[in-house]
Amino acid sequence: MTKQDLMDIIVKVAPGSPLREGVDYILDAGIGALIIIGYDDEVEKVRDGGFLIDCDYTPERIFELSKMDGAIILNDDCSKILYANVHVQPDNSYSTTESGTRHRTAERAAKHLKREVVAISERKKNVTLYKGNLKYRLKNFDELNIEVGQVLKTLESYRHVLNRSLDSLTILELDDLVTVLDVANTLQRFEMVRRISEEITRYLLELGSRGRLVNMQVSELIWDLDEEEESFLKDYIDDETDTDSVRRYLHSLSDSELLEVENVVVALGYSKSSSVFDNKIAAKGYRVLEKISKLTKKDVEKIVNTYKDISEIQEVTDEDFSAIKISKFKIKALRAGINRLKFTIEMQR
């Protein structure tokens, strides 16, 4: 099962969802429950006894039905309660690491049916989610708050480091002093920020409606990440290389592999060797030019396709810009924008 499978389950039991409301009723009452989400022929084969309910789901109804010993079966979107008080008999050949009867049955049923199963422990007062070989215990609100706070601080720190790295890179680009190592270090930081933001997404799903404030903070930190990375990659990879393929390669690296900058250099089309670190490399100019609001994407493409890099673009005369149909107003905005960018970065240092 994939991370997406885990997220799909968490969404169904996140605070604010109808199913979670019913689960909370069950937890507060100090009773347990086993809930199977979805029904098909395979579920019918493992269903023994119980009785047909076939009514609309409400938190109150599932709470009342959980007072009986058997499992509860819901439809795929949890909008209907199909069966209650069911004895579930999954194939015992499926292994389980659980100790309690309810959780052993839940884990085996999830593996057998390839469906989502929710087990609520009356003794430990916790909720465990299963699907296939996937198993995940929901954290309580206090645990989540602590962990989210830690991850959010890490994201803020890494985003700050990335921003400083991009500022330094901008000055190097304008002075024509960029090396392969400078670019690889920045690309490495982009991927680190992306991974931390993906990690916090799972926490936000688990927080559900309680995570609105954190969600706003995360959105503020990463709102321009994709666009900034796209411009950055277009500056340094050759025209035949797809930016998505670079991202896929970086995503395939383990955390420890990502920390080795030699692996990141490969994404830029260089050999996996430190000997290339000091090689000079020039930015085409996408990232810098796209920060100048008066230039359209068409203008940026025209300039980048005409001149080889941002260093050369700074030396182009007004007449040469006019020759490629860049207006005097935009030429002035371009020059002022680059000077303002330099000044702003220097003031922030």
Curated annotation (Swiss-Prot):
Catalytic activity, as annotated: 2 ATP = 3',3'-c-di-AMP + 2 diphosphate
Subunit (UniProt): Homooctamer.
Residue ranges annotated for the DAC domain, each copy included: 3-143
EC number: 2.7.7.85
Cofactor(s) named in the record: Mg(2+)
Protein's name in the database: DNA integrity scanning protein DisA
Ligand binding (ATP): 70, 88, 101-105
GO molecular function, one term: adenylate cyclase activity
BP GO terms, sorted: DNA repair
Gene: disA
InterPro entries recorded: DisA, DisA_sf, DNA_integrity_DisA_N_sf, DNA_integrity_scan_DisA_link, DNA_integrity_scan_DisA_N, DNA_integrity_scanning_protein
